């Protein structure tokens, strides 16, 4: 955890369009029946940019096009995103369509194609309706920015938009970091579809931004799970356009920890919003592991627990079945000494010294009825700490995914 003064960072009611020099739009172009389905984020000038991508062998066409754009100069000025269609597993035609989305967006803005990132989310294995995309890009050119339109345009089975914003003080200058995300099902990212877009007006060194994003993604977006599946389209992208006018940030700068903490808060906030909005979910589950052999092992254990379908269903059924947590810990391949492990729920110790502990089933059940549930695990193997987030598994999840294409 990055430690900085709370006075230097504050959360605001802003969005991905709040940092200086950005605007965001969303329109309905016909990929979905009636809801918005095409969005764009635009920076007033080229922004230093970084991204992390899905580790799936079946990377979607837009991922490949965005990687190519960033490889050229590590700068972007826009990102175009469609929902309802992932443009994944669509062969050469899918790649051509992604390039065409990039070209049309660049022409609309009067910029080079390499300054545009492309992202898609939705059904896998169907070709994009480029007639609708072309119409949508024309609509974006004519449409005025409106709060929440971009965030709505990138949703699929999500039930709510996901956005956040923080303000920081860097060298006496106000710096803003905003973010938007989508994700509800198929969430088990290892950089689901899980998409995250972060904007900042900070001036920052390219390599420092990429390293920070990679490190922070590992403890935020990569620590959430809804159903254990990794998508073909997962991506987290950050743009930094320098409009705040701060002294250029790098890893040795005295205010680097402040910026890095702000970025971590934005990514963690978005990750938790995704976990909370898991398909059919009624509860956010947080698992905190302390005393593991290393931070990595703590993260592995936490994610193993929160990803267990048995744990998820127990939480849904308000059943303090700690045996399911033990099973997940034992299956994590981390260093485990059973006699040292302690499991706590709602302030009650359920398991310690490799044996059950007396606890109130009634109090545990009442605690599990909350919309947020925290499971604490103490390993006593070292100093490692890790947290993961997920949601309960309900009948509604099966219902949603049984009829996803109908």
Swiss-Prot record:
Keywords on record: Acyltransferase, Amino-acid biosynthesis, Arginine biosynthesis, Autocatalytic cleavage, Cytoplasm, Multifunctional enzyme, Transferase
Binding annotation for substrate: 156, 182, 193, 279, 401, 406
Listed EC numbers: 2.3.1.35, 2.3.1.1
Functional pathway: Amino-acid biosynthesis; L-arginine biosynthesis; L-ornithine and N-acetyl-L-glutamate from L-glutamate and N(2)-acetyl-L-ornithine (cyclic): step 1/1; Amino-acid biosynthesis; L-arginine biosynthesis; N(2)-acetyl-L-ornithine from L-glutamate: step 1/4
Top-rank taxon, per record: Bacteria
GO cellular component: cytoplasm
Enzyme class: transferase
Site feature location: Cleavage: 192-193
Site (Involved in the stabilization of negative charge on the oxyanion by the formation of the oxyanion hole): 121-122
Single GO MF annotation: glutamate N-acetyltransferase activity
Subcellular location: Cytoplasm
GO process annotations (BP): L-arginine biosynthetic process; ornithine biosynthetic process
Subunit structure and binding partners: Heterotetramer of two alpha and two beta chains.
NCBIfam families linked to this entry: ArgJ, PRK05388.1
Function as written in the Swiss-Prot or TrEMBL entry: Catalyzes two activities which are involved in the cyclic version of arginine biosynthesis: the synthesis of N-acetylglutamate from glutamate and acetyl-CoA as the acetyl donor, and of ornithine by transacetylation between N(2)-acetylornithine and glutamate.
Name the UniProt record assigns to this protein: Arginine biosynthesis bifunctional protein ArgJ
Organism: Bacillus licheniformis (strain ATCC 14580 / DSM 13 / JCM 2505 / CCUG 7422 / NBRC 12200 / NCIMB 9375 / NCTC 10341 / NRRL NRS-1264 / Gibson 46)
